[in-house]
UniProtKB/Swiss-Prot annotation:
Residues 1-4 are lumenal. This is Photosystem II reaction center protein Y. It is a single-pass membrane protein. One of its GO terms (molecular function) is manganese ion binding. It is found in: Plastid, Chloroplast thylakoid membrane. It comes from Cyanidioschyzon merolae (strain NIES-3377 / 10D). One of its GO terms (cellular component) is photosystem II. Residues 24-35 are stromal. Its main location: plastid. The gene is psbY.
Amino acid sequence: MDTRLLIVLLPIIAAASWAIYNIGKILLLQLTKRS
C-alpha cells in the first residue's frame, strides 16, 4: 500500500463515514418521531 494513496483516501473515507453516520442519525430520528 502506497502511503500517499492512504493520505489521499483517509479524508475521503472519513467524510463518507461521517455523512453515512449523519444520514443514519436523521433516519432514526424520523422513524422514532413517526411511532
